[in-house]
Amino acid sequence: MSYADQVFIQNCKEILAHGTWDTALPVRPRWEDGESAHTVKRFGLVNRYDLRREFPVQTIRKMAFRSAVDELLWIWQKKSSNIGDLHSHIWDAWADETGSIGKAYGYQLGVKHRYREGWFDQVDRVLYDLRYDPASRRILTSLYNHHDLHEMHLYPCAWSVTFNVTGNVLNAVLNQRSQDMLTANGWNVMQYAVLLHMFAAVSDLVPGELVHVIADAHIYDRHVPIVEEIISREPYPAPTLWMDPAAEDFYSFTPDSFRLEGYRAWPLERKIPVAV
């Protein structure tokens, strides 16, 4: 049984059984028909994934692994906020007529900042510190720039990553202010597990723990029947992540640099409505 499945099932059961509904409150998200998209939530979920044991991917529903990696590279490698650089349509609802999602996600990672050692963007600063100052407790990124929030078409959900080197092991804490459990949980866990593998590989480190901290873990009202169906399934064993050993530079990775070997998963036959 995949450990990612165990975590997801446990989280969803906890939310459905003991969560709090926001139906009495005004909410921002809307369904395609204009109706308010309400949620049931739990506050402060913390999940730990040891990447030395297995790669965390759900099998109780088939995950679009390649698309998830493509979006990860769009943000962290291309540092783009234009959907023209993305090979999927997951951001179309938040893009303007030019294809931009504003000063969000990749834009923030690409802004150069002045440090004592010189000018770096946030990704290059992480790479620098992992190589030259791995004992630092200051290796982190943040996408939640209050100065630019008014120019973001969607505020960052997964907004901060703190990296920590323990011996020769690279660990990371992913902070997420908001998590749509059905559409995004398995997706984000896969992505940041891949990201941890990438940083570890180019820094001569071993990928260790990914700790996922979710402030508001929620299930939308119209997602409840789909979630109940998915978590009733019998999980398959976790697949193995293959990563191209020839990719020795962070910026040389492509979607073809990764694949899941031995991945068996249940098909997702129901269309998932997305609240915007």
Residue ranges and their predicted role:
Residues 1-276:
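Terminal, non-catalytic protein-protein interaction segments that mediate quaternary/complex assembly
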